[in-house]
Regions:
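A generic structural signal for short hydrophobic patches within well-formed alpha-helices
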Residues: 12-13, 43-46, 73, 117
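Short active-site oxyanion
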Residues: 33-36, 62-64, 103-108
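Acidic catalytic patch
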Residues: 64-85, 94
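Acidic, metal-associated active-site segment
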Residues: 46, 89-108
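A general structural signal for well-ordered alpha-helical segments in protein cores
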Residues: 22-23, 43, 53-56, 73-76, ...
Length: 130
């Protein structure tokens, strides 16, 4: 059964930094056939200062990076409107939530902001703290 593990910027940064917990989670997901993914906006948002560009390229080559298309932005905008949210903080979360809501189920999101992501994703998506 296809499933998806989505990483927000904190989860992706921890993967870049070889955090043992996140590495183990991603490896277990991959071994189980779970698709590990993030968004292009999340890749841009993740912490780059302490990470060698080659490490970033290597990590991103091993996970799915979803493009932020007009369709995705329309879905994200609808989520923001329906929850009366706005601004860049919520925009990036809404893009991740739009991808999560349309990804093969079951979907898990690894995030530093479980409250906002849970609100935007709804009950069909499992949210765990990074």
């Amino acid at each position: 059964m296809p499933s998806t593990l989505l990483l927000d910027s904190e989860g992706l940064s921890k993967l870049y930094l070889k955090d043992r917990t996140v590495l183990a989670l991603v490896q277990a997901a991959s071994e189980e056939g779970t698709r590990v993914a993030t968004t292009a906006m999340t890749a841009l948002e993740a912490d780059y200062e302490r990470i060698h560009p080659a490490r970033i390229r290597w990590v991103l080559s091993r996970i799915d990076v979803h493009d932020v298309t007009k369709s995705v932005t329309d879905q994200a905008a609808a989520l923001l409107r329906s929850h009366h949210l706005s601004g860049p903080k919520y925009a990036i979360d809404a893009v991740l939530a739009a991808i999560a809501r349309s990804a093969p189920r079951p979907v898990t999101v690894l995030t530093s902001d479980p409250e906002d992501i849970s609100l935007l994703c709804g009950p069909a998506v499992e949210v765990i703290k990074a």
